[in-house]
A protein has these predicted regions:
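Catalytic cores of secreted or luminal carbohydrate-active enzymes
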Residues: 109, 134-209, 307-323
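Membrane-proximal, lumen/periplasm-facing interface regions of secretory-pathway glyco-
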Residues: 3-35, 275-281, 311, 318-329
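Beta-sheet entry/capping signal
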Residues: 1, 44-47, 114-115, 136-138, ...
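Nucleotide-cofactor and metal-assisted catalytic machinery
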Residues: 55, 104-107, 114, 127-130, ...
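Extracytoplasmic/lumenal acceptor-recognition loop(s) of multi-pass membrane glycoenzymes
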Residues: 2-17, 35-108, 145, 150-169, ...
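Periplasmic/luminal catalytic loop of GT-C fold multi-pass membrane glycosyltransferases
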Residues: 90-136, 142
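Short, polar loop motifs at secondary-structure junctions
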Residues: 52-53, 117-123, 361-363
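Active-site-proximal, structured, solvent-exposed surfaces of multi-pass membrane proteins
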Residues: 200-439
Length: 439
């Protein structure tokens, strides 16, 4: 009877993953592609699955495919803060417990996401098709930075914080951000960032006003619709060959009992959760970094009543991405040299500079350069960096989990006490048994 009940429960439970659904995440074609990728390229890089980015945030492939994504209740707060507040990443989910595979090309470049699994036949800005199997294709990111690299371009944190958020994207693509106490000189920021004029933004706002149920008050839009709406709007100027950076403030507290709201542009979604939601995502500031723009935008507004204001827009030319790759020297290493708690490799540089790992900063690391331990810094707001002189060097990073040594000592002491207690208990019981026999 229990077996019958268990069977009926499982076949009717819609929350269980069915075999056909599992095939979307793991199948022979996907396995073939990841195996082919790792066999052809044994260097150290990250990958991501664009076909199922949320369901596969914690899913590794082939044992040597590293990820920049994680869904967990415990995570590195410094890295999480960087993920949610730098590089114009979108926030498309209802909480801040996930570091998902966003659609932001700059983020994937910066984090060393070299290979992307997607459906075949796509034309993707910055990517080239590499391998194909069945309905799937591995695309190579032509601009992906190494996970570990050296550069002689940097600015101080003080200068970085004086820049607006779009200028900060350019800073991070042009060099590294150093703590004030170690940034003795600074690079000059390129002048490639272009601000979209107020007149051009006004033209777009007028188009939105004509196409959507909105009420305008200057540059503020009040959106009120019972159904989601999607329309394609024209831009006053083509953005082909450029990155388009957009930001805006969104407020869904203008009416009582508001639900979640979202705005999606060219398939990139930002969501603001209902004010009453217990895991509120605090995403009042929507940012988009678009790499597939020509002279139109596909714009979607969710149902609800909410306000949009403070709209800003910028463009960056593609050459910024090319220069970002050209001005760094990669760490020579393989996936096999990045195992367990150790990262090792060699690097040769012509100038004094800094070595950076796009690995989240933590106090548990030790690093040696040519066998000599070196102090490291928190660079680029959330990552690991060390000064590095010109020449050829062997670098080894080792991670020691905070509290691990203390935990091992406590475990050994506890085990010793248990053994002592067991021995004493056995001795006492034996003596008591002998007394009973004698008596």
């Amino acid at each position: 009877m229990q077996l019958v009940y268990s069977f009926l429960l499982n076949v009717t439970d819609h929350t269980l993953l069915k075999q056909e659904c599992l095939q979307q995440y793991q199948n022979a074609d996907i396995d073939t592609l990841w195996k082919q990728t790792t066999e052809q390229d044994d260097s150290w890089y990250r990958v991501y699955n664009a076909t199922q980015p949320y369901a596969t945030a914690n899913q590794t492939q082939q044992g040597t495919c590293f990820l920049s994504t994680v869904y967990a209740s415990v995570q590195n707060k410094t890295y999480s803060n960087f993920y949610y507040h730098q590089l114009f990443n979108e926030t498309s989910i209802r909480n801040n417990a996930a570091v998902d595979a966003v659609k932001n090309l700059a983020y994937h470049i910066w984090m060393g996401n070299k290979y992307r699994l997607d459906f075949k036949g796509k034309t993707l800005f910055g990517y080239e098709p590499k391998y194909t199997s069945g309905d799937y294709c591995i695309y190579e990111n032509q601009y992906a930075l190494p996970i570990g690299y050296a550069t002689d371009h940097w600015i101080s944190m003080d200068t970085f914080q004086q820049h607006n958020e779009a200028e900060q994207v350019l800073d991070l693509l042009s060099g590294i951000v150093l703590p004030e106490q170690v940034a003795d000189t600074e690079m000059k920021q390129p002048d490639s960032l272009q601000t979209i004029s107020e007149q051009e933004i006004e033209s777009v706002l007028q188009t939105i006003e004509q196409e959507f149920p909105v009420t305008r008050n200057g540059n503020t839009l009040l959106i009120s619709t019972e159904q989601p709406m999607t329309k394609t709007i024209s831009l006053p100027k083509s953005c082909a060959g450029k990155l388009l950076l957009l930001s805006m403030e969104v407020d869904n507290t203008v009416v009582a009992n508001s639900d979640d709201v979202f705005i999606m542009i060219n398939g990139i979604k930002n969501k603001l959760t209902a004010p009453s939601w217990k895991y509120h995502n605090q995403n009042y500031h929507f940012t988009y970094l678009l790499s597939d723009v020509t002279d139109t935008l596909e714009l979607s507004f969710s149902a609800g009543t909410y306000q949009v204001s403070s709209i800003h827009a910028y463009t960056l030319p593609e050459i910024v991405l090319e220069q970002a790759v050209q001005q760094v020297t990669p760490l020579e290493t393989t996936a096999e040299q990045v195992r367990g708690d150790t990262i090792s490799g060699t690097i040769t540089t012509e100038k004094d500079g800094w070595f950076v790992l796009s690995v989240p900063y933590d106090t548990g690391f030790t690093v040696t350069v040519d066998g000599k331990e070196t102090a490291y810094e928190n660079v680029n707001l959330a990552f690991l960096g060390i000064p590095l002189s010109a020449g050829t060097h062997e670098i080894v990073w080792t991670y020691h989990a905070p509290g691990a040594a203390t935990g091992k000592k406590i475990t050994l002491i506890t085990a010793g006490m248990l053994l002592l207690w067991a021995g004493l208990s056995y001795g006492i019981q034996r003596k008591q048994s002998e007394r009973r026999i004698l008596s």
